[in-house]
Amino acid sequence: MNILAPVRRDRVLAELPQCLRKEAALHGHKDFHPRVTCACQEHRTGTVGFKISKVIVVGDLSVGKTCLINRFCKDTFDKNYKATIGVDFEMERFEVLGIPFSLQLWDTAGQERFKCIASTYYRGAQAIIIVFNLNDVASLEHTKQWLADALKENDPSSVLLFLVGSKKDLSTPAQYALMEKDALQVAQEMKAEYWAVSSLTGENVREFFFRVAALTFEANVLAELEKSGARRIGDVVRINSDDSNLYLTASKKKPTCCP
């Protein structure tokens, strides 16, 4: 019995979504990794289609974390601000290169008094989205601490990082250009991919989350292929080891009959 919701038609990815800015991207490839494409075509993705990948969204109070998630998951925008208490999450189902894939988006509180509660949910993230307000330079400066807190509970070498500027609709072109310059530098220092979005208008929101889903999926498949490759190598070593032992055992046996 399949208890998972079916994949919506607008959540199907047949190609790799492109980055916003090449100078601050996790990678600039135009297509999925060839090994990933091949594995999907041959249905060698292991347990990837059954896993739920955890994505945490962190950042200062009122930078627009909840609005960002709601715009993508529910296609809504609520102008009446309500602070997140503790944590909340949404589940999104995708189909990437014909393989089902699920993201669990964790919306964490930005208030200091809930920080301790929220941080307990950071562990096990495969992607971290650090959100700041494009109209508030202090919120950009604070992203470094938010990232440091999140990485205390995760392996920095195995998590994907995204730096997202929100409320782009409130910036003039001149204001945005200045903030983007600083944000790109921060993203490069973090080794994060940079995006700028507007939850009010929906600008870049869909493209951003598709990019998150695609890169997280790609990382999962590559990890699965590495595991399966290691298992195959291990099996060969064990077989060869057993063969050697059998040979040594046989050579030590005395003949049971006379020549």
Swiss-Prot record:
Known outcome of mutating I85T: In OFD20; likely pathogenic
Cofactor: Mg(2+)
Keywords in alphabetical order: Acetylation, Cell projection, Ciliopathy, Cilium biogenesis/degradation, Cytoplasm, Cytoplasmic vesicle, Cytoskeleton, Disease variant, Golgi apparatus, GTP-binding, Hydrolase, Lipoprotein, Magnesium, Membrane, Metal-binding, Nucleotide-binding, Phosphoprotein, Prenylation, Protein transport, Transport
Topology versus the membrane: Lipid-anchor
Protein name: Ras-related protein Rab-34
Short motif Switch 1, span: 71-89
Chief localisation class: cytoplasm
A molecular function GO annotation: GTP-dependent protein binding
Quaternary structure, from the entry: Interacts with RILP. The GTP-bound form interacts with REP15.
Subcellular localization, as worded in the UniProt entry: Cytoplasm; Golgi apparatus; Cytoplasmic vesicle, Phagosome; Cytoplasmic vesicle, Phagosome membrane
Gene that encodes the chain: RAB34
Assigned protein family: Belongs to the small GTPase superfamily. Rab family.
Positions occupied by motif Switch 2: 108-127
Binding positions for Mg(2+) per the UniProt entry: T66, T84, D107
Positions of S-geranylgeranyl cysteine lipidation: C257, C258
Activity regulation summary: Regulated by guanine nucleotide exchange factors (GEFs) which promote the exchange of bound GDP for free GTP. Regulated by GTPase activating proteins (GAPs) which increase the GTP hydrolysis activity. Inhibited by GDP dissociation inhibitors (GDIs).
EC number per UniProt: 3.6.5.2
Gene Ontology biological process: antigen processing and presentation; cilium assembly; cytosolic ciliogenesis; Golgi to plasma membrane protein transport; lysosome localization; phagosome maturation; phagosome-lysosome fusion; positive regulation of smoothened signaling pathway
Catalysis performed (reactions): GTP + H2O = GDP + phosphate + H(+)
